[in-house]
């Protein structure tokens, strides 16, 4: 009886949280009143839903908590506690995902068009060093997913030489952009409100698509590389750790740096390293 009551309480909590979450990610980075005015909206971001209180971990952050995947309306009618336990086990993740987020190497910032913003000679050296470092870890990487922007593609080309046989996939979701208005604001970088509105939805979609606990069918731990951009990585780190996403600009990442996130089967997330470039000589480290 106690088991049934506990399940009912947990089910109500998870169901309520799931129902409150809207997949209208376009609300991320909602424009400020009056364009560049400092007045901030008090409307919560769409992806936050009914989040727990400050400092409380949301165990169903990726909407893959086993209990939330069961049709609770049918539970009492079609199956009992034994069947419920079996279904929970069916949806339960078994493997750990290791996410390696790589920032692209130094590039020509003066290129008039995106295709002209190619890696500098130093940037190519940085990519070589990053590739060597990843290969030295001795891990069986499952795939490389990279931004479709030129500097990310060229970084991937070089790193891939050190990881033969690892498949690579290009995506527009990981392209650089303005994820959400930073807090505190900065004076040297002020995108238009519409850029936050458009880029924010895309980058949030990238987070939801790629950052989550392993599928229940995955039997072994996976090691995945994502080669993209500083803003995207910093936003993803904040979201994954359930830190305020507006704080993304407080983090700093060097070119070619390695950030390592771990997502456990129970949905817990840990940050192993942030922006590691300790494998590069000091004179090879840049942030441009």
Swiss-Prot record:
PTM text: Phosphorylated by the RIPK1/RIPK3 complex under necrotic conditions. This phosphorylation increases PGAM5 phosphatase activity.
Record topological domains on the Mitochondrial matrix side: 1-6
Subcellular location: Mitochondrion outer membrane; Mitochondrion inner membrane
GO biological process terms held by the UniProt record: necroptotic process; negative regulation of cold-induced thermogenesis; positive regulation of mitochondrial fission
PANTHER family: PHOSPHOGLYCERATE MUTASE-RELATED, SERINE_THREONINE-PROTEIN PHOSPHATASE PGAM5, MITOCHONDRIAL
Region of interest: Interaction with KEAP1: 76-81
Stated role: Mitochondrial serine/threonine phosphatase that dephosphorylates various substrates and thus plays a role in different biological processes including cellular senescence or mitophagy. Modulates cellular senescence by regulating mitochondrial dynamics. Mechanistically, participates in mitochondrial fission through dephosphorylating DNM1L/DRP1. Additionally, dephosphorylates MFN2 in a stress-sensitive manner and consequently protects it from ubiquitination and degradation to promote mitochondrial network formation.
Self-association state and partner proteins as the record states: Dimer. Forms a ternary complex with NFE2L2 and KEAP1. Interacts with BCL2L1 and MAP3K5. Upon TNF-induced necrosis, forms in complex with RIPK1, RIPK3 and MLKL; the formation of this complex leads to PGAM5 phosphorylation. Isoform 2, but not isoform 1, interacts with DNM1L; this interaction leads to DNM1L dephosphorylation and activation and eventually to mitochondria fragmentation.
A GO MF label: GTPase activator activity
Modification N6-acetyllysine, positions: 115, 143, 190
Keywords of the record: Acetylation, Hydrolase, Membrane, Mitochondrion, Mitochondrion inner membrane, Mitochondrion outer membrane, Necrosis, Phosphoprotein, Transmembrane, Transmembrane helix
Topology Mitochondrial intermembrane: residue spans: 30-288
Protein's name in the database: Serine/threonine-protein phosphatase PGAM5, mitochondrial
Catalysis: reaction(s): O-phospho-L-seryl-[protein] + H2O = L-seryl-[protein] + phosphate; O-phospho-L-threonyl-[protein] + H2O = L-threonyl-[protein] + phosphate
GO cellular component: mitochondrial inner membrane; mitochondrial outer membrane; mitochondrion
Residue spans crossing the bilayer: 7-29
Enzyme class label: hydrolase
Database matches in SMART domains: PGAM
Residues annotated with Phosphoserine modification: 86
Site description Cleavage, residues in chain: 24-25
């Amino acid at each position: 009886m106690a088991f049934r009551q506990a399940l009912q309480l947990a089910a109500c909590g998870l169901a309520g949280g799931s129902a409150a979450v809207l997949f209208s990610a376009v609300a991320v980075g909602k424009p400020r009143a009056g364009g560049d005015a400092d007045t901030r909206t008090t409307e919560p971001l769409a992806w936050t839903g009914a989040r727990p209180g400050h400092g409380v971990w949301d165990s169903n952050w990726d909407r893959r908590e086993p209990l939330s995947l069961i049709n609770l309306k049918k539970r009492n009618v079609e199956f009992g506690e034994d069947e419920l336990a079996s279904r929970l086990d069916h949806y339960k993740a078994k493997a750990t995902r290791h996410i390696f987020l790589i920032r692209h190497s130094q590039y020509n910032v003066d290129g008039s068009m995106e295709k002209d913003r190619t890696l500098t000679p130093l940037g190519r050296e940085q990519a070589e060093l990053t590739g060597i470092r990843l290969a030295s870890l001795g891990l069986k990487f499952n795939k490389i997913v990279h931004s479709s922007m030129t500097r990310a593609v060229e970084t991937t080309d070089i790193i891939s030489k050190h990881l033969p046989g690892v498949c690579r996939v290009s995506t527009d979701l990981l392209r650089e952009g303005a994820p959400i208005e930073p807090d505190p604001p900065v004076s040297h970088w002020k995108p238009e409100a519409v850029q936050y509105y458009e880029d924010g939805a895309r980058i949030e979609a990238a987070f939801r698509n790629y950052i989550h606990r392993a599928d229940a069918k995955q039997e072994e731990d996976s090691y995945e590389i994502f080669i993209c951009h500083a803003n995207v990585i910093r936003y993803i780190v904040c979201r994954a750790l359930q830190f305020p996403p507006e704080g993304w600009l407080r983090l700093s990442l060097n070119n070619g740096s390695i950030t390592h996130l771990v997502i456990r089967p129970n949905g817990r997330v840990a940050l192993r390293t942030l922006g590691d470039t300790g494998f590069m000589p000091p004179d090879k480290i840049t942030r441009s």
